[in-house]
Design a protein with these regions (language model features):
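Structural preference for beta-rich elements and adjacent junctions enriched in aromatics
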Residues: 1-211
Length: 211
């Protein structure tokens, strides 16, 4: 499996603002090898970083984009599901039974759900709200999403084992078409080698290795 090494920091109190300016991000490894295996167009730069202390793991997406799209809908999940977003999926093993999904739009709204194989989704499940925090900022040519998740919640869900978290890292980019509709380009860290875009399979996951 593809591996990303999550460095540790001695900084104890870390407040995320979603602006990318906290000094801890300079300590983290940078992951930029994202692609859309189903699309010939060049993918604009996506930079993913993660770092942890004894209490929490912190994730950051910095995404080059000068035209972010948010789908207008009264229903939050319907809106996020059709908008520019970043995604983290976590599994305890490759059976995907279950796995947990966080899909976050450019304004920092979360669509979180528990899933089982064959896209069986439970939207009544939520990541415990006191164990996760999300902040974001949108700029002229890029947006940033930062996520803080408690180590304890990852252990409770059996997702952090022996310093490893099996993780999928994704992005949905919505592009305006000639008829003014918006269609997604599906972007992933690990190429699942499927004919059509599908992140909800075991081949789309890699490993975060906590140091």
């Amino acid at each position: 499996l593809e591996t990303y090494k999550v460095k540790s920091t001695k900084v104890k109190e870390i407040i995320i603002f979603g602006d990318g300016n906290h000094p801890i991000w300079k300590e983290a490894n940078s992951l930029t090898n994202f692609s859309s295996p189903w699309n010939d167009q060049l993918v604009k730069k996506i930079e993913f970083k993660a770092i942890h202390n004894s209490e929490k793991i912190y994730f950051q997406f910095k995404v080059d984009d000068n035209q972010t799209f948010t789908y207008p809908s009264e229903d939050k999940n319907d809106s996020i599901n059709n908008s520019d977003r970043v995604e983290l999926f976590f599994r305890s093993d490759d059976s995907l039974n279950p796995y947990y999904c966080l899909e976050i739009d450019t304004s920092g709204r979360i669509m979180d759900f528990k899933a089982k194989p064959n896209k069986e989704f439970d939207f009544n499940w939520n990541w415990p709200s006191q164990e996760i925090e999300v902040k974001s900022t949108v700029h002229k040519n890029y947006f940033i999403v930062e996520i803080a998740i408690s180590i304890q919640s990852l252990k409770d869900l059996k997702l952090l084992k022996n310093g490893l978290i099996e993780t999928g890292i994704y992005r949905a980019k919505y592009n305006q078409q000639k008829d003014n509709s918006f269609l997604p380009t599906w972007i992933t860290w690990v190429n699942p080698k499927t004919e059509t875009p599908n992140f909800h399979i075991s081949n789309s996951f890699g490993v975060l290795k906590l140091k």
